[in-house]
Amino acid sequence: TEYYDIIFSSGVYHFIKSEIRKEISANLKEYTNKNGIHAINVFVDKPFVEVPPDKDVNRFRWISGELFMLYHDWKLHKTEEIIFNCNSGGVPHQHCMDIMIAERVK
């Protein structure tokens, strides 16, 4: 089994079903070298941000901070939540995203 120095994921985690998120994250963490980095972002739902018209039917809901909690035992270099404008599909709308950079220190 290979160990990794960096795991980068953008636009992927919102396709992971809630019942297997903890298991997948634990597996990725287990196979990351000491001082390895995970840089991950995930779309999160907010009651005041309308569901985008281009929402993929296979997207699974995440809540604010859920990603960060999966890495509570790692050093968190960055945790940020942003709301940004988007015009995909030709329809102006917004997305909310949690962004994390975490380091395995043990």
Give the location of each predicted region:
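A short beta-strand submotif of the Rossmann-like class I SAM-dependent methyltransferase core
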Residues: 9-12
